[in-house]
Swiss-Prot record:
Name of the encoding gene: dut
Entry protein name: Deoxyuridine 5'-triphosphate nucleotidohydrolase
Species annotation: Rhodococcus erythropolis (strain PR4 / NBRC 100887)
GO MF annotation list: dUTP diphosphatase activity; magnesium ion binding
Keyword annotations: Hydrolase, Magnesium, Metal-binding, Nucleotide metabolism
Signal peptide span: none
Task of the protein: This enzyme is involved in nucleotide metabolism: it produces dUMP, the immediate precursor of thymidine nucleotides and it decreases the intracellular concentration of dUTP so that uracil cannot be incorporated into DNA.
Pfam family, any one: dUTPase
Record EC number: 3.6.1.23
InterPro entries with a match to the protein in the record: dUTPase, dUTPase-like, dUTPase-like_sf, dUTPase_trimeric
Length: 164
């Protein structure tokens, strides 16, 4: 694919590397921590990455957890994926959470803590209407398609709340 998008990037911390892909063709680039921090079990903290970017209108940056860190230590992102809008020009920060119930996680300056994926997006105009067209799904929401025993509302002890 020769249609590469160029994105302006400002290094706010010159000692940290410019975000890079771990392998050619990877969708995400790694983001690094600007500081040392310990995240206690069940706690969260906002961590800087030392970069700011200028995304073009019609694109979005999505900050995802690193799968290896999530699997091995329980480190994730509170609002995964984090959304970076095209108009934002501040430092990219990541709200990390330690999902491990017992062990603290030590982050060191320069550690790769998240991935940034840039995607093109539609910018639709919403039109208010009196009613929506009917579909086979209708208003079926959370759990309505089944596929797991816990979603069976006839099971003993099953609780289905309002608006679910």
């Amino acid at each position: 694919m020769s249609d590469h998008l160029s994105i302006a990037l400002k290094r706010l911390d010159p000692d940290l590397p410019v975000p890079q892909r771990a392998h050619p063709g990877d969708a995400g680039v790694d983001l690094c921590s600007t500081s040392d921090v310990t995240i206690e079990p069940g706690h969260r903290t906002l961590v800087g990455t030392g970069i700011a970017i200028a995304l073009p209108v019609g694109t979005v940056g999505l900050i995802h957890p690193r799968s290896g860190l999530a699997a091995k230590s329980g480190l994730s992102i509170v609002n995964a994926p984090g959304t970076v809008d095209a108009g934002y020009r501040g430092e990219l920060k990541v709200c990390l959470i330690n999902l491990d119930p017992a062990t603290a996680i030590d982050i060191r300056r320069g550690d790769r803590i998240a991935q940034l994926v840039v995607q093109r997006v539609e910018l639709p105009v919403f039109e208010e209407v009196e009613s929506l067209d009917d579909t086979t799904r209708g208003t079926g929401g959370y759990g309505s398609s089944g596929g797991h025993a816990i979603l069976d509302t006839d099971a003993p002890g099953a609780v289905v709340g309002e608006g679910v």
